[in-house]
From Swiss-Prot:
Location of the region described as LID in the Swiss-Prot/TrEMBL record: 104-114
Highest taxon above the source species: Archaea
A biological-process GO annotation: ribosomal small subunit biogenesis
UniProt-recorded Gene Ontology molecular function terms: adenylate kinase activity; ATP binding; ATP hydrolysis activity
Keyword Nucleotide-binding: yes
EC code(s) of this entry: 2.7.4.3
One matching Pfam family: AAA_18
Protein name per Swiss-Prot or TrEMBL: Putative adenylate kinase
Organism classification: Archaea, Thermoproteota, Thermoprotei, Sulfolobales, Sulfolobaceae
Residue ranges, annotated region (NMP): 30-53
Keywords: ATP-binding, Kinase, Nucleotide-binding, Ribosome biogenesis, rRNA processing, Transferase
EC class name: transferase
Amino acid sequence: MIIVITGTPGVGKTTVSLLLSQRLGLEYLHVSTFVIERKLYRSYDELRSSFEIDDEEVAKELNRYLSERKNVVLETVYPSLVDNADKVVVLRKHPKVLYDELKKRGWNDIKVIENVEAEIIGYVAQEANEWFKETCEIDVTNLSPEEVVNRILGNICDKPVDWLDLPDVQDLLLALDKIIS
């Protein structure tokens, strides 16, 4: 069974993926670590403190790796790197809560704002929905990691989230715009 856990940085992918893999007795794979260990990146972006990957090369190597294994919980911000999955879960988090989480990590404003804006517009969720026939979206904002795992195992999904419908998120967007202006 290949389970993909995806979402913007800061939504809890690592914690949930590790917990899920332990509960199911499946291998855990962090795609970013996979990329770094195999040097599947083009360069390092100092401003964003992140590696720029070669999508095609990563997808090829990742899918070759997955073809040799049948029981993996895979964590990634790039769901389209995976050709086949038995279950795809998109974790979502209220943008204000996500903003606070990313700031706590000590990330610079540009990196924080880009990731919060990606969550607001549902960038990762949209990519997952375009790439896979079925996805399960879960708003993790007020859930513990254990509750999220229980929802995954129980196949309890939320309706797709549209953060732009919320006035406080619109206010947050305006505030973020002022920071980068």
